[in-house]
């Protein structure tokens, strides 16, 4: 089990890289994360939803994702509360305090999923959550040491040298851990080294000396990993998602507080001809060729935030200039005339006026639609594929002008009368090269990007090569025996 000294130290990519490396060696590997907190979710092949990081790790193992790989998924809806997804299905909502009381009841479910995966595999690579040293949350823990001890899984602690203070982070983790928890730790990894690794040889020795843990690798920064999807919205602001480009075509994206499934944007960010601008709160949307309003976990609250930051004014000005606007899932709902949440599924019950750019209205309902879809651009021979993941029924006269056709008598999405404003529930739309080329052609630019899925595969193989070179994988296998 790879735990971390903190959030965003690279646990997800370490697991993905080692998973691909072991899979290439001929082992049957399964990824597992007992508890994840993310609004970036994926549809599991056996139903329900899991964190997209675990879906990527499953891909690294060359298998379809299962809801057992992430049995507890927390999808933040406010500063103090989240939607709780258990084994792929929505379990309810809870404040952070209420969830702390609920965790011991979920341990059995977590162990059940882990047991199912363990029976399928030669090795299960487990990823912890956040920091292993948050001892204030240790009681009832199911994400880190609580799980490790319950499942009797050896632990490796990962630290991030790029952010500084990695010696203190690792030694400090050993210091604050309960002795029985510390006894589960077999070694450590130092991740994201930049420059000459030999300059930190003494640091590795000091960590070994101070902790008694075995050094299992000093892992340099891996540039190839930038082609892989970011897990956390904060990574977007830190520039850790898709490669930065400086193309002439500017696409602006407002960073909604509860932005969801933002890996929709990765293929556009990888285009040489495109500059994808993620606009943080407090900054105006720049003059752009297109604006994409992304998915959202709390649509009414994020629509209010969009107005608070003045982005609605920027979007309406962009519309008057006759430039393209695309809404994805929650962003699609925001483009309509109104959004209604009569039962308070995403927050306080009520309604909100939309941006009024599409002739639709949406009512949020308890049933969550989770399905993979494929078809083509309406009235065009342009194939599309992706998935839907939303709560809400959309109606209105605008639906007479659908964006997509997803089967016989299955129109989907909406387009304004002049074709400038578009909305859809289909995530993953830009991953298809044909639709991406079509979209960029409407912006008078050619697509120079290759197949995005091929790029992800190449990045996973490059990451596996990186792990083979810098991680003591044979020692990891010995620890798991």
UniProtKB/Swiss-Prot annotation:
- List the InterPro entries hit by this protein, alphabetically: Class_I_gatase-like, CobQ/CobB/MinD/ParA_Nub-bd_dom, CobQ_GATase1, CobQ_N, CobQ_synth, GATase_3, P-loop_NTPase
Spell out the catalytic residues.
329, 427
Entry keyword annotation includes Cell cycle:
no
GO molecular function term, any single one: catalytic activity
Q: Does the keyword Lipoprotein apply?
A: no
According to its UniProt record, which protein family does this protein belong to? Belongs to the CobB/CobQ family. CobQ subfamily.
What is the stated purpose of this protein? Catalyzes amidations at positions B, D, E, and G on adenosylcobyrinic A,C-diamide. NH(2) groups are provided by glutamine, and one molecule of ATP is hydrogenolyzed for each amidation.
Protein name stated in the entry: Cobyric acid synthase
Gene this protein is translated from = cobQ
């Amino acid at each position: 089990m790879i735990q971390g000294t903190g959030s965003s130290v690279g646990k997800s990519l370490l697991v993905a890289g080692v998973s691909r490396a072991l899979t290439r060696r001929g082992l049957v590997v399964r990824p597992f994360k007992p508890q994840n907190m993310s609004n970036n979710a994926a549809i599991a092949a056996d139903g329900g939803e899991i964190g997209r990081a675990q879906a990527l790790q499953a891909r690294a193992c060359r298998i379809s994702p299962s809801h057992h790989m992430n049995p507890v998924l927390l999808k933040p809806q406010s500063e103090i509360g989240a939607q709780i997804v258990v084994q792929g299905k929505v379990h309810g909502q809870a404040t952070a305090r209420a969830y702390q009381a609920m965790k011991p009841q979920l341990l059995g479910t977590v162990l059940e999923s882990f047991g199912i995966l363990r029976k399928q595999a030669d090795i299960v690579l487990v990823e912890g959550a956040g920091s292993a040293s948050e001892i204030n949350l240790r009681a009832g823990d199911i994400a880190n040491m609580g799980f490790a001890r319950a499942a009797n899984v050896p632990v490796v602690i990962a630290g991030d040298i790029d952010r500084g203070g990695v010696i203190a982070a690792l030694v400090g983790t050993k210091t604050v851990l309960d002795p029985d928890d510390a006894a589960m730790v077999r070694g450590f990894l130092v991740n994201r080294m930049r420059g000459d690794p030999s300059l930190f040889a003494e640091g590795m020795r000091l960590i070994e000396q101070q902790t008694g843990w075995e050094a299992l690798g000093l892992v340099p920064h891996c540039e190839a990993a930038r082609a892989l999807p970011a897990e956390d919205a904060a990574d977007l602001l830190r520039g850790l998602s898709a490669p930065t480009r400086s193309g002439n075509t500017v696409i602006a994206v407002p960073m909604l507080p509860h932005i969801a499934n933002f890996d929709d944007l990765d293929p556009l960010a990888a285009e040489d001809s495109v500059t994808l601008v993620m606009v943080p709160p407090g900054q105006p949307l720049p003059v752009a060729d297109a604006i994409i309003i992304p998915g959202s976990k709390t649509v009414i609250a994020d629509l209010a935030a969009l107005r608070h930051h003045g982005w609605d004014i920027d979007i309406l000005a962009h519309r008057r200039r006759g430039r393209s606007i695309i809404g994805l899932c929650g962003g699609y709902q925001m483009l309509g005339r109104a959004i209604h949440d009569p039962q308070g599924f995403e927050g306080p019950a009520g309604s909100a006026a939309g941006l009024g750019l599409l002739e639709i209205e949406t009512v949020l309902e308890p049933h969550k639609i989770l399905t993979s879809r494929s078809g083509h651009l309406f009235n065009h021979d342009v194939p599309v594929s992706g998935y839907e993941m939303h709560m809400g029924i959309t109606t209105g006269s605008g639906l007479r002008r659908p964006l997509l056709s997803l089967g016989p008598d299955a129109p989907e999405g909406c387009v304004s009368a002049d074709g400038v404003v578009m909305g859809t529930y289909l995530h993953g739309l830009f991953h298809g090269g044909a639709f991406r080329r079509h979209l960029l052609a409407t912006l008078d630019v050619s697509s120079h990007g290759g197949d995005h899925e091929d790029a992800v595969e190449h990045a996973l193989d490059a990451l596996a090569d990186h792990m083979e070179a810098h991680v003591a994988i044979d020692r990891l296998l010995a620890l798991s025996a």
